[in-house]
Amino acid sequence: MNWLTNVVRPKIRNILRRETPENLWIKCPDTGQLVFYKDVEQNQFVIPGSNYHMRMGATARLRSVFDNETWYDVALPEVTADPLKFRDERKYVDRIKDARAKTGAHDAVKVGYGKLEGLGVVAAVQDFDFMGGSLGMAAGEAIIRGLELAVEKHAPFIMFAASGGARMQEGILSLMQMPRTTVAVQLLREAGLPYIVVLTNPTTGGVTASYAMLGDIQLAEPGALIGFAGARVIEQTIREKLPDGFQRAEYLRDHGMVDMVVHRHELRPTLARLCRILTKTPLPAVEEPAVVDDDAQDIEAVATEIVATPPEPAPPPAAPQA
């Protein structure tokens, strides 16, 4: 009996077992509801019902912004992978390899150029899944290159921020990207081009202390965590209890730090409208279909029938009687 239970039965179970993909279902962080992954993906990673905004990868974000889901990937400068030969529990180069394998991206920032409702724009997206969207040399160079391209193309620049801050494995070289990106934003301003920032969940640390809070227009997604230091650190420093919703997008909007909180489904038309207003670009001409008037059709049909069927000649007048 032991042979049957210990050897044969496990083998049968292994044969009949069907593996279930890990990402088949998604649990809503707000309500705990289990939602089918494909439904969330088709809904732009917004949980149906609760409207909780999940994190969005860089490629999916660019796909949701540009017309026909097409754009040109901007070639980005190469940087030294591990300038400080940094190691904590693991080597920094090993962490980068794992992040690249997980996301399929070269680093935390992806830049694209394409059309947004017919208007050429440059967009940069931080991917939080790549080492927390941390700002390092590669990310800094990517943002700067995107801003330079916007000046070259005379196009608006849209920044989708999502980061835990500067990348500690690169030390001062990471912190250097804060003033460098700030200078690049200023060059865009001097060219008279709009810089629009979309703050997504989360945007914290050195990113909020630099380019993420320099937008001509500051947008945020609902419920996004936005701040420099964490709420717990602030409470321990000031020895006071923070108000409810502190550092959330809605709180920042109510206190003047953010211009608008925009649902992800409304983000694309909102960005297009802002870009057109700030660049004084008229709406593209739309050929309106000819309006068919049923009454006019009836009149035309009757007129055609009258022309095609001439009236019968009138009978000759009768002779007068004597």
UniProtKB/Swiss-Prot annotation:
Residues 24-293 form the CoA carboxyltransferase N-terminal domain. Coiled coil: none annotated. SUPFAM superfamilies: ClpP/crotonase. Pathway: Lipid metabolism; malonyl-CoA biosynthesis; malonyl-CoA from acetyl-CoA: step 1/1. One of its GO terms (molecular function) is ATP binding. It is found in: Cytoplasm. Its EC number is 2.1.3.15. InterPro entries: AcCoA_carboxyl_beta, Acetyl_CoA_COase_Trfase_b_su, ClpP/crotonase-like_dom_sf, COA_CT_N. PROSITE patterns: COA_CT_NTER. GO terms for cellular component: acetate CoA-transferase complex. It catalyses: N(6)-carboxybiotinyl-L-lysyl-[protein] + acetyl-CoA = N(6)-biotinyl-L-lysyl-[protein] + malonyl-CoA. Keywords: ATP-binding, Cytoplasm, Fatty acid biosynthesis, Fatty acid metabolism, Lipid biosynthesis, Lipid metabolism, Nucleotide-binding, Transferase. The keyword Lipid biosynthesis applies. GO terms for biological process: fatty acid biosynthetic process; malonyl-CoA biosynthetic process. Belongs to the AccD/PCCB family. NCBIfam families: accD. Acetyl-CoA carboxylase is a heterohexamer composed of biotin carboxyl carrier protein (AccB), biotin carboxylase (AccC) and two subunits each of ACCase subunit alpha (AccA) and ACCase subunit beta (AccD). Component of the acetyl coenzyme A carboxylase (ACC) complex. Biotin carboxylase (BC) catalyzes the carboxylation of biotin on its carrier protein (BCCP) and then the CO(2) group is transferred by the transcarboxylase to acetyl-CoA to form malonyl-CoA. This is Acetyl-coenzyme A carboxylase carboxyl transferase subunit beta. The lineage of its organism: Bacteria, Pseudomonadati, Pseudomonadota, Alphaproteobacteria, Hyphomicrobiales.
